[in-house]
Amino acid sequence: MTRKLAAYAAGLMACSSFTAPAFAQDSEDQATPTPPRDDNVIIVTATRRAQDVQDIPIAVTAISPQALENQGVDNIQEVATLAPSFTSSQAQLASGSVVLRIRGVGTTSNNIGFESAVGIFIDGAYQSRPGVALSEFVDIERVEVLRGPQGTLFGRNTSAGALNITTKRADVNEFEGFVNASYGSFEEISVQGAVNVPIVQDTLALRVTGAWRQRDGFLDVVDRTGTVIGDTNDVDQYLVRAQLGWDTESGVRGRLIADYSKSKSSCCGAIELFQSPLVTGGAYAAVGLGLNGGNGQSVVATTPFDQTTFEEALDNRTVSANFAPVADIDNWGITGELEFPISDSADLIFIGSYRKYESFENYDSDFTDLDIFNVDALELELETWTAELRLQGEGAEGRLNYVLGGYFSDESIDQSVSFALGSEYDENVGALLFVPTGGALGPTPLELFTGIDPAGTSNTNRFQQSAQSYSVFGNVSYELVEGLELTLGARYSWEEKDGGFTQTAVNNQICPATLGALGFIPAALQPSFIGLGCFGFTAPADLPQSAVLPLVRTFQSEFSDEELIYTARIGYAFADPVNIYASFTHGYKAGGINLDTTAAVGGADPTFLSEEVDAYEIGVKSRFLDDAVTLNLAAFYEEFTNFQVLEFTGTAFQTFNVPVARSSGLEIESAIRPTDELTFNASATILDARYPEDCAGTSTAVTVLSLCGNKLTNAADVVAIFGGLWEKPLTDSVEFFLSGQIRLESDQRTSTQAIVPPGAAQIAAAGSVQAAIDAAPLIIADVQDGKEFINLRTGLRFNDGQFAIEGFVNNLTDNVVRGVTFNTTLRGSGAANSRSAFSLQPRTYGVTVRAKF
């Protein structure tokens, strides 16, 4: 499918009739009819100046509110339907496992100490984690996907790119608003609305926005017999946002925004794709855990690389667990923006924000109906302050534009996780040890050697961190000669973090007892007994034996760093509709502290290094045929050093830096409007994002060396989007419309590792680490086959869009795909590990009614 998609994408360059970024409606007033072509632009602030997206010399996908509406985009994850270089995936946690990627680059989540490589900014305020920004998309003025490192102007952690989201401003002139209501599959009900009220005409206004959405889960939860006991991956959330905006005759303008969102959605269930040979070989049955090893799914592959059955398991939409996951999230914040003119050509702008994010989650962490290992409570409190002050203006009769400023953020993290071993934990240990011992240890090996049943073992691990970031920055653009503009920018950033891991409650007798019984356990089995008797998530910390054995240790660590981030860019306007540019950017993403129980095992340093990137880009932006056709091209090469990686092995989260990773490719965005009624758009990203063969540098770590030569996760070689919009007036007051779009994705990897990293025995047998890696088997169920995703929406609009009724279907062909595939917890090892995956949403359909006033 990759070759087919590459042909599609290459055809974009040859066929201007199917090329360019979707035509934008005027973002100032989405209620008005389509304006004349000369006004058919999106004004963006990607350079911290309001400019036509076609005039700025950077790669940015600008999405209008009408485009969001036509595609039914409800949150940041669904922006991928409109931007081929952007992808999103989600793993287990509602609060912290969303991964955003731009140009194939992103930071794997599930560790609260990790920050995203894609920065998210809402109304100019930095959102410290993607999960914080997952609330409902409603009353949005525009979304900008800034591709490539953006750290010079956009604050923190934008080594891959940024999402710049702007909500609709309060209008000081008009009373207006809207109400939308939808009903769809899985009993989904959604209501959105906003009202804008001028308080002091032309000076002060209040805008209140709200949204509520509820939907049943699209995955059934079954017990070990296959009986349905519930569902998961549902939606139950609401949002309220109030905005006070002012605009005075003196030029002072600003707004104060307060928002609160609540989510009680169940997220997220994992489908077992491949069943461990320990199950099919009878080890689980031999210890009394049943022929299916506690997995009640009716479909699961039992032979490696059975792609057909992997797909059938996904299509079956069933997960096996003791109970459906529970999440309860409160998210609220305040953002203030003040623009103060200090002269006719310069403004002082302040943006400050405070946000508090609190969550409670409870889930079955072994992903089967066996009672092995649960997270009884995961409680997170995330508090963030940000402040930015900018002086920006122009000089030299408009040839000079500048931005100077300073930025500060202060973040505190407090996460407590209560883990518990279940009533069948020891039997699961018996199954894991059945093959190497020939079943000689019976069904309960831990109790056999210690006299203690591990059931009920529990503890509470607490992770805390405080982080401060400071920076000063400047960006200057100067028109050297007519049409030729040079831009130079720099930011100097300081990062400080202080955090660690402690235990606040421990009820664990099995670990000390296991260590005390090591003298009675055969030497070959001792590492397994240590790992299972002192399971990393539930083991007591700082036991005396931790000085010589790989046991959990508490830690308190500090991280500090500083970096100069800089960019140079030159752009030339051949004529009004054609602009070319070339740029170089040195970007940065701060390192930090691995907030995990195993981070300091063996005296390891729990910190990880900062990530840096050098990015080169050339591009052209053009409009022609009286602005009926738009065609943008961008070619890029990005080289990352100390690329940050987090991997879940099935028993622990490993955090490390890979010395080198690269992303290069070509991006195409295009649109054509042959008539006032028809608009076609097409875009594509042709990508090569990978760890090069020499990615390890001087590192000898197996986890690093085993990545070299493989593609990055969720980095499809080709993603192409084709769409169209037909708006046909039927009478003076009635308009028919039909909107359709298809997103094509080639094959892509869904795991961190592409092979099964060799252990000490394999390395010794092979004679070297590299020889063992070369001989290692591919990891099972890593590659997701290429797919297509088709969205359609049609309906009638009345009275110039004042009222509308619409029908929609998303994912028409019902392709259920996986974004993340991983080793199932405590269910085998190496090539004998079970493999599970988190799936994305299936086909949905429904109706929407809209009213504007």
Per-region residue spans from a language model:
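N-terminal Sec signal peptide and the immediately downstream disordered periplasmic leader
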Residues: 1-81, 251, 334, 340, ...
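Gram-negative outer-membrane beta-barrel transporters
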Residues: 27, 402-405, 482-486, 630, ...
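Acidic, small-polar-rich N-terminal luminal/periplasmic segments of exported/outer-membrane proteins
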Residues: 35-174, 618
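Outer-membrane beta-barrel translocator/receptor signature
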Residues: 115-117, 129, 138-147, 152-240, ...
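Periplasmic-side early beta-strands and strand-to-turn transitions of outer-membrane beta-barrels
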Residues: 164, 173-174, 180-182, 198-293, ...
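Structural signature of Gram-negative outer-membrane beta-barrels, strongest in the C-terminal barrel
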Residues: 245-247, 391, 401, 405-409, ...
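Membrane-embedded beta-barrel scaffold of Gram-negative outer-membrane proteins
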Residues: 337-341, 347-363, 573-596, 607-666, ...
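C-terminal beta-signal and adjacent terminal beta-strands/loops
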Residues: 426, 743-762, 796-853
